[in-house]
Amino acid sequence: GGISSFIHHQSHYLIDSLRYLTFKRLMKATFADALFYLFAISFGLIFANFMRVKITDLLPDIDMSTFKNTAAIDSVINSFNTLMAIFFIVTVTYFLLLVIFWAVFKGSFWSILMKRSYSMRYVLNYFWLSLLWLGIWTGIFIGSLFLFKDSVIVGVMLLFGFLFLHTSIPVYIVFTKENKIKHALKEGLSIAIGGIHHFLIPYAFIIIFYVGLMVSILFPLLRMATGGFAGIISGLFTIVFLVWCRVYLLEMIAYHAGYQMR
């Protein structure tokens, strides 16, 4: 009946995802994913430190005497305008670098999982898709800060964060298979939105599975680790788990949408 069919499908996704994710493929995909986060976080810290230095240089300590001096006020305003211009340039530069890292490393990640050719044409198309896709979602997140009240903004951000993750996976799966931007957006969103009911149980299973692994594996390891090593273990555990999650969802999408990985 329905229950036996449901159990069969879920076990099918799980078994096939574990069978497909060989040790070599897991290591290569994990390495590509880890490199993205390494570069993204490292450059983020570099730009953040750069802005901290600029703020210190351009905006001196301000006291009440500053507001009694017209020249001092003009100087502060000019410094603030300069700082805003620098902030804009740094933000745009970091966003473009982030898209490049996304195209190079996330593109490599999906090509590894789906056994697709990793070529310059593929990376360039991945870059243009990501520039459009991440640009749209960045605009949505920024716009939300101005459109929603403080009392609901956290919930709205969480909702949009979920929608971003939920729609991104099918979009990039379709793109990696076809290497066509327009088709990836159309078909990927169709799978994500039109077939959202297919994702609900797998999402619940992923959460339960993650909690179970944390309790049975991660927490015991962390109790034996010390200092920064504990952070490294947590990071690698999370990245490896997320690699499996995407293979698991890829198996589910392959079943319902007919997308073959092999």
Where are the language model's segments positioned?
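Signal peptide-directed secreted proteins
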Residues: 202-207, 219-222, 242
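Long, highly hydrophobic alpha-helical transmembrane signal-anchor segments
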Residues: 22, 47-76, 121-153
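Selective recognition of hydrophobic, aromatic-rich stretches within alpha-helical transmembrane segments
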Residues: 84-112, 133, 137-183, 224-261
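Short, small/hydrophobic-residue-rich motifs at membrane-helix boundaries and re-entrant hairpins
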Residues: 28-105
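Interfacial aromatic "cap" segments that immediately flank transmembrane helices
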Residues: 2-39, 120-142, 165-214, 251, ...
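Juxtamembrane "helix exit" motif at the C-terminal ends of alpha-helical transmembrane segments
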Residues: 40-56, 142-145, 212-224
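Membrane-helix interfacial "entry" motifs
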Residues: 21, 25, 75, 79-83, ...
